[in-house]
């Protein structure tokens, strides 16, 4: 499979291996699947085929896969559960296997009606774990305290301020190029999951943090250059960003749940607590389904009741605009009406 995803060996016959590679290319190029999804699906299919090979006594081909009954699929799930795989992991495995079988059916390679009868385990998704408002503000203020090189500290502050001020995923933030967030820009264009683009308003606090970082970074570059870079000038790795966050939370005594993604959760939770419309938050986060965004309404009331009056902790810092300005920048159809509050 292309796209930088490492190849995994499949315990199967050549015809099935070729089909799996074609399916992987289809996922990547036609469906716009992320590297994480590609890697996970390949691992799930590799485990499934290894299970089938072990229990049939030989690596399966396409004909063997087409002949599997519902009991075989259920036995695989039972084996995964016995190995300690949780409901969420098994549910994702079913999604990956089902995706391959459906693609193979549409491609005329095999037909297996049993896969349509396989139900995925119900995974109880954990509630988002946002930071308290004061902790989020403290983290952004102290974000430059960890690195030895001043420009790296400014980079971390700019990155974490962007995550919190715009609600981006870490992959979206480090995927930005300089042209995506030009100086003084009122919004940033983000390429989200499935290759979907969205425009997110940018607060002055975010613009100021990014400008300070760009003024200090020793690596140049044109509009196509990555916005966030590592110590050698290459595009910043998400693992480096997570490591910097671990160091920072240890320094500040913040809980282990303080991660780059927690800043995205905090963005949504604090906006909701300030009265932002749920559909506006859905658009800002790039959620395909409103039900995903609705999880934030179930977050512990302690988080919502402790939110300040105007919607965002950055509003308490002199010279910084509140996140209500993000809502004001949205189309009228996305804003709460007074009669609805």
From Swiss-Prot:
Active site: 169, 193, 261, 264, 287, 296
Classification via InterPro entries: CB, DNA_brk_join_enz, Integrase-like_cat_sf, Integrase_catalytic, Integrase_recombinase_N, Integrase_SAM-like_N, Tyrosine_recombinase_XerC/XerD, Tyrosine_recombinase_XerCD
GO MF terms, alphabetically ordered: DNA binding; tyrosine-based site-specific recombinase activity
Organism for this UniProt entry: Rhodospirillum centenum (strain ATCC 51521 / SW)
Domain Tyr recombinase: 126-309
Keywords: Cell cycle, Cell division, Chromosome partition, Cytoplasm, DNA integration, DNA recombination, DNA-binding
Subunit structure, interactors included: Forms a cyclic heterotetrameric complex composed of two molecules of XerC and two molecules of XerD.
GO biological process: cell division; chromosome segregation; DNA transposition
Protein name, entry field: Tyrosine recombinase XerC
Record family assignment: Belongs to the 'phage' integrase family. XerC subfamily.
Protein purpose: Site-specific tyrosine recombinase, which acts by catalyzing the cutting and rejoining of the recombining DNA molecules. The XerC-XerD complex is essential to convert dimers of the bacterial chromosome into monomers to permit their segregation at cell division. It also contributes to the segregational stability of plasmids.
One family name in Pfam for this protein: Phage_int_SAM_1
């Amino acid at each position: 499979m292309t796209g930088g995803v490492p190849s995994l060996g499949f315990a199967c016959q050549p015809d099935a291996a070729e089909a799996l590679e074609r399916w992987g290319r289809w996922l990547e190029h036609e469906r716009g699947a992320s590297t994480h999804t590609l890697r996970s699906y390949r691992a799930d299919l590799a485990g499934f085929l290894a299970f089938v090979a072990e229990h049939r006594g030989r690596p399966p081909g396409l004909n063997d896969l087409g002949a599997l009954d519902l009991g075989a699929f259920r036995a695989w799930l039972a084996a995964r559960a016995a190995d300690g795989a949780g409901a969420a992991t098994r549910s994702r495995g079913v999604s990956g296997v089902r995706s391959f079988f459906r693609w193979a059916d549409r491609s005329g390679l095999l037909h297996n009606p049993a896969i349509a009868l396989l139900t995925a385990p119900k995974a109880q998704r954990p509630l988002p774990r946002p930071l308290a408002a004061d902790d989020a503000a403290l983290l952004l203020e102290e974000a430059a305290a960890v690195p030895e090189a001043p420009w790296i500290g400014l980079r971390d502050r700019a990155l974490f301020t962007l995550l919190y001020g715009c609600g981006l995923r870490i992959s979206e933030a480090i995927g930005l190029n300089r042209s995506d967030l030009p100086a003084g820009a009122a919004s940033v264009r983000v390429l989200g999951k499935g290759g979907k683009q969205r425009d997110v308003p940018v607060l002055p606090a975010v613009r100021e943090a990014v400008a300070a970082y760009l003024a200090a970074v020793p690596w140049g570059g044109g509009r196509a250059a990555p916005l966030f870079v590592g110590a050698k000038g290459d595009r910043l790795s998400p693992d480096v960003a997570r490591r910097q966050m671990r160091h920072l939370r240890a320094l500040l005594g913040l809980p282990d749940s303080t991660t780059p993604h927690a800043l995205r959760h905090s963005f949504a939770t604090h906006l909701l607590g300030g009265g932002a419309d749920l559909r506006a938050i859905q658009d800002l986060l790039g959620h395909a389904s409103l039900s995903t965004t609705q999880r934030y309404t179930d977050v512990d009331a302690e988080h919502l009741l402790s939110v300040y009056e105007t919607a965002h902790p950055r509003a308490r810092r002199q010279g910084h605009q509140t996140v209500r300005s993000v809502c004001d920048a949205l189309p009228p159809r996305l804003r709460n009406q007074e009669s609805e509050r």
